[in-house]
Amino acid sequence: MINLNGVQFSYNTFTFELDLQIPAQQKVAIIGASGAGKSTLLNLIAGFALPQQGEIWLNGENHSQTQPYERPVSILFQENNLFTHLTVAENMALGLKPSLKLTALEQQRVQQVASAVGLQGFLNQLPTQLSGGQKQRVALARCLLRDKPILLLDEPFSALDPDLRAEMLHLLLQLCDEKKLTLLIVTHQVNELQQKMDRMIRFEHGRMSESTILKDNFNEKQTAL
């Protein structure tokens, strides 16, 4: 569950203000023009930006001023941030331990997640040997290995072609269902997501201008603000 209560954040001439409640396991698409506040929302939830007013509650705990590593959140950006000198398995394992000194059980988890995202045959390869879609699978696997209940994605598949985007989105939604994750995804591909999300939120000028329930699984109503 995500609750933002009276959150305010300002940077230069930009002001972000928001009250927002997202139930656990809801899948939400965040849309709007560039500079509308979409990435600011993710940064506030992840802890890369701190609110100047208001509170941020994540899974029942106040995380308004906690550090990113303390939050029940994983985040995936468009840039997959893979280390080119590490193998696929090692890049994935960073989600468990930065030291890469894994126990036998942790190594088994890497194998399991690799299988879930279709990378079991690529674990010993370097990122330079992978396609764009495969690199994003590695980055997604690393997020899943962190085993956090909230997953944030900022334009994660926009650099991929439409077929690969559809494939990655199908995989993502399947894994979210299996792991019972709460998902927020920033996107410009509105048509590709509209039938697959539970909710769509539009931002304009640092404020939520519209919240539309696409699948009424959470007993909410459509709201235009």
Curated annotation (Swiss-Prot):
Show the stretches that span the lipid bilayer. none
- The answer, when asked if Nucleotide-binding is one of the entry's keywords, is yes
Q: Which reaction does it catalyse?
A: thiamine(out) + ATP + H2O = thiamine(in) + ADP + phosphate + H(+)
Class of enzymatic activity (EC top level): translocase
Q: Where is the ABC transporter domain?
A: 2-225
Where does the record place it? Cell inner membrane
Domain of life of the source: Bacteria
Q: How does it sit in the membrane?
A: Peripheral membrane protein
Please name the GO terms that the record assigns under molecular function.
ABC-type thiamine transporter activity; ATP binding; ATP hydrolysis activity
Q: Per UniProt, where does ATP bind?
A: 32-39
Q: What keyword terms does UniProt attach to this protein?
A: ATP-binding, Cell inner membrane, Cell membrane, Membrane, Nucleotide-binding, Translocase, Transport
> What EC number(s) is this enzyme filed under?
7.6.2.15
Q: What is the first-listed, main subcellular location in coarse terms? A: membrane
SMART domains per UniProt: AAA (SM00382)
Functional description taken from the UniProt entry: Part of the ABC transporter complex ThiBPQ involved in thiamine import. Responsible for energy coupling to the transport system.
Summarize the subunit comment.
Answer: The complex is composed of two ATP-binding proteins (ThiQ), two transmembrane proteins (ThiP) and a solute-binding protein (ThiB).
The family line of this record is:
Belongs to the ABC transporter superfamily. Thiamine importer (TC 3.A.1.19.1) family.
> Under what name is this protein listed?
Thiamine import ATP-binding protein ThiQ
User: Which gene is annotated as encoding this protein in its UniProt record?
Assistant: thiQ
